[in-house]
């Protein structure tokens, strides 16, 4: 069984390239340091997920990602729409800058970002002072865990630990929209 981590222990695990599990708005998530390519590949291997799909970043402050984003390419109206939806359960695919790591964007020219209103996710990101990879805690193609006790036992030996707490109670994972077009990619 993976160890339960405090926020400061989770930050240490992330700094060391570890993958952690934590509750999100609807399901349990897996996260790691998005700046560490090895950590991201470890997470992808745990999930058995293709690297080309891209990954979501969750953060407490958009400015933690300013070097990876090209927000000047969005219309003022669209940028206002994005910012007005946060914090909240809305993920937006924002225009990525050339500095955005390819191991996060996958085969895309955008970066999927959510500023979470979930208290634990927000506290974790603030303690970490950086964005965090946020992908469902399950093997690709399997159902995501809605409770800690539902985490797939095959994932646990590969985790640096678990930040315990309740999910946000949403019935479905967060929506994903393209910030350039406004199109809904996942409802």
UniProtKB/Swiss-Prot annotation:
GO cellular component, one term: cytoplasm
Annotated GO biological process: regulation of translational fidelity; tRNA threonylcarbamoyladenosine modification
Subcellular location: Cytoplasm
Entry-linked Gene3D superfamilies: DHBP synthase
Keywords: ATP-binding, Cytoplasm, Nucleotide-binding, Nucleotidyltransferase, Transferase, tRNA processing
Reactions catalysed: L-threonine + hydrogencarbonate + ATP = L-threonylcarbamoyladenylate + diphosphate + H2O
GO molecular function: ATP binding; double-stranded RNA binding; L-threonylcarbamoyladenylate synthase; tRNA binding
E.C. designation(s): 2.7.7.87
Function noted in UniProt: Required for the formation of a threonylcarbamoyl group on adenosine at position 37 (t(6)A37) in tRNAs that read codons beginning with adenine. Catalyzes the conversion of L-threonine, HCO(3)(-)/CO(2) and ATP to give threonylcarbamoyl-AMP (TC-AMP) as the acyladenylate intermediate, with the release of diphosphate.
Family: Belongs to the SUA5 family. TsaC subfamily.
Protein name as catalogued: Threonylcarbamoyl-AMP synthase
Source organism per UniProt: Xylella fastidiosa (strain M12)
